[in-house]
Amino acid sequence: MTRYVLVTGAYGGMGSAAVKALAKRGFIVFALDRKVGEAVENIIPIEADVTDPDSLQRAFDSVRGLTDRLFAIIHYAGIYTLDSLVEIPDAGFERMFRVNVFGAFHVNKIFFTMLGDGSRIIMTTSELAPLDPLPFTGLYAVTKSALDKYAYSLRMELQLLGINVSVIRAGAVRTNISVSRPTRSTLSVGKQSSTNATPSTSEG
């Protein structure tokens, strides 16, 4: 039986690795990201922005045209910046929440009707960020903590429908999300911030 999986942040480091591994194992993977590659065997690129419900609705329509059931939704979409919690612009603060927290919320809400008994939702968070945040990574830690609590609460609700929700606490992985170019000094201790750098929207 053909099994279909939706992966967000599918063209980032961890997302891309997951997509390739799933495709190799015979899953048909809907690879969702803002910028996508060419379709290859078992991988169907879906261009969409997790912060834009209209974009996700179009993605849903594309997926729904090929199948009415998803075996799993796997979340890798996310952004990361280094910044001071007292200096980060409001727009930067809000954007990280829109991608890291609301992104998962929007995807799950829109694609929920394609899940059924035995389906799964897998959230990817940082192993250390929610538990032991470091200086200038506080906002990232806050969003990942929120995603943790969202996932655990969602698990209790969806288990009533036979849908499993899991959280993967990934350790440190060298990917584009962790490569940021400092652009200005922050605070008086000589630390650096990457607020003005272009963040990746793919976790990994």
Name these PLM-found stretches.
Residues 11:
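Conserved glycine-rich cofactor-binding loop
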Residues 76-81:
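Conserved NAD(P)H cofactor-binding loop of Rossmann-fold oxidoreductase domains
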Residues 41-54:
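Rossmann-fold cofactor-recognition segment
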Residues 25-39:
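Conserved glycine-rich Rossmann-like NAD(P)H-binding loop of the short-chain dehydrogenase/reductase
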Residues 122-146, 152, 156-159, 172, ...:
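Catalytic loop of short-chain dehydrogenase/reductase
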Residues 160-204:
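SDR active-site lid
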